[in-house]
A protein has these predicted regions:
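DPxDG-like acidic metal-binding loop motif
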Residues: 62-98
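N-terminal beta-alpha supersecondary unit
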Residues: 2-67
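Stable alpha-helical structural segments in soluble proteins, enriched in small hydrophobic residues
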Residues: 49-53, 88, 106
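Residue-level signal for well-ordered, solvent-exposed loop/turn and beta-edge residues enriched
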Residues: 25-26, 71, 140-141
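Surface "functional belts" at beta-alpha junctions
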Residues: 2-3, 37, 92-173
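Glycine-rich nucleotide phosphate-binding loop and flanking beta-alpha elements
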Residues: 16, 71, 129
Length: 173
């Protein structure tokens, strides 16, 4: 039997900045889409979400952070915060793929409508390229059906057309 842990997670790889606390049954989160403000907002967001969840930092058993793809500066903000928190209490850190988190967020917010179809996640990588990954939920776990890759936007459009995903999520202008 898998024992669920109290987890504090941060996502700073995209234009949005988010923090969540999850105990396996309930999730509390804060989300900010204010550009270029991750470093200014994240610590107060951690405090706010812990307060809302009625959880003290001493109750956190594990930390999670997105490791990319994504904004280099944004990723460093998330890494720095999680590294500091992990060091303070010698907590384990779970690395998460940003594109898989985007797919999981879609599933969480559309669970009643979601089938078992492919979800393709995209992030703008600039210079006419995007990071792309394709994921399928089997009822228990995500499988990585299209390996995370960097593609020209036109190539990504063709791949999406050919694969006919249930949903495309992410951030490409």
């Amino acid at each position: 039997v898998l024992e669920l842990k109290m987890i504090l997670a941060v996502e700073t790889a995209t234009a949005a900045c988010s923090v969540a606390v999850c105990d396996g049954s309930k999730t509390f989160f804060r989300y900010s889409k204010e550009p270029r403000s991750h470093s200014e907002k994240i610590i107060s967001m951690v405090g706010d979400v812990l307060k809302e969840a009625k959880v003290s930092f001493s109750m956190i058993e594990r930390l999670a952070v997105t490791i990319g793809p994504g904004s280099f500066t944004g990723l460093r903000v998330g890494f720095s915060v999680i590294q500091g928190l992990a060091f303070a209490r010698d907590l384990p850190v779970v690395p998460l793929c940003t594109l898989e988190v985007l797919a999981a967020t879609y599933r969480r917010t559309h669970i009643e409508k979601m089938g078992d179809g492919l979800v393709i996640s995209l992030l703008n990588a600039r210079m006419g390229q995007c990071a792309l990954g394709g994921f399928r939920w089997d009822g228990n776990f995500w499988s990585n059906e299209i390996a995370v890759c960097l593609l020209a936007i036109d190539t990504a459009k063709r791949l999406i057309h050919d694969r006919e995903p249930e949903m495309v999520v992410g951030d490409v202008d």
